[in-house]
């Protein structure tokens, strides 16, 4: 649910280009495009393009996936203070549940391709993007939580394996103990739950969700980067 496979692919490709002395080719857009080609075309994974672009670009961005297959990346710069404020209003928990992202996404892909009402749900999810970007830019954290909640309600209808009774119970507990909204990250079925929650309510929330572990995190601002390259190999 944290985009680990796509992050690995982007990082591996970045490293290969650096070792070949072709680091100048490792633009954010090119790394993302190559990673998409490897995962979607070469490996045939039934996934989207969001994770690859998020890993390559880093930071907060609005990605627009256009009909011609191109991707437009619009940075969402909150500044140092705004980013810190955003981080302080988000809490991340690991549910302990394991799931196959590919199997859930395969079902989701099949169902969205064969059922017209699924396209309506996807359109509604897309319609939440600009309001969420506006809420982030203007520090409207309660609205951010409400939009995350609305997105999660829509996402659950896309495939049967996205949620389960345990996840539903955890989510309901969170809403009853300070969270204004949230969502399960990734394909669904398990992994990490992200909640919007005022800092003053986070201790209460964590205590209520005592059966799962809270994970501290910070937002990555730079995307993929090579930390060390052997000069003898470029």
Residue ranges and their predicted role:
Residues 2-23:
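DPxDG-like acidic metal-binding loop motif
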Residues 19-20, 33-46, 52-182, 194-234:
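C-terminal nucleotide
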Residues 27-32:
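Short, charged, amphipathic alpha-helices and their helix-cap/turn boundaries
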Residues 190:
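Glycine-rich active-site/cofactor-binding loop and its immediate structural neighborhood
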């Amino acid at each position: 649910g944290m985009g680990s496979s796509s992050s690995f692919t982007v990082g591996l490709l970045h490293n290969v280009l650096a070792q070949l002395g072709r680091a100048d080719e490792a633009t954010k857009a090119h790394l993302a495009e190559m990673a998409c080609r490897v995962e979607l075309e070469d490996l045939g994974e039934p996934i989207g393009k969001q994770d690859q672009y998020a890993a390559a670009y880093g930071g907060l961005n609005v990605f627009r996936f256009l009909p011609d297959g191109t991707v437009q990346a619009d940075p969402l710069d909150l500044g140092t203070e705004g980013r810190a404020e955003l981080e302080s209003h988000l809490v991340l928990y690991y549910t302990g549940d394991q799931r196959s992202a590919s199997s859930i996404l395969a079902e989701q892909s099949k169902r969205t391709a064969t059922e017209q009402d699924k396209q309506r749900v996807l359109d509604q999810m897309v319609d939440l993007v600009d309001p969420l970007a506006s809420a982030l830019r203007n520090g409207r954290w309660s609205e951010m939580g409400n939009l995350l909640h609305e997105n999660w309600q829509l996402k659950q209808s896309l495939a049967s394996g996205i949620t389960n009774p345990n996840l539903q119970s955890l989510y309901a507990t969170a809403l009853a103990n300070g969270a204004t909204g949230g969502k399960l990250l990734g394909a669904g079925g398990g992994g990490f739950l992200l909640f919007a929650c005022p800092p003053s309510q986070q201790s209460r929330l964590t205590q209520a969700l005592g059966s799962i572990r809270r994970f501290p995190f910070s937002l990555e601002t730079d995307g993929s980067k090579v930390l060390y390259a052997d000069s003898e190999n470029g």
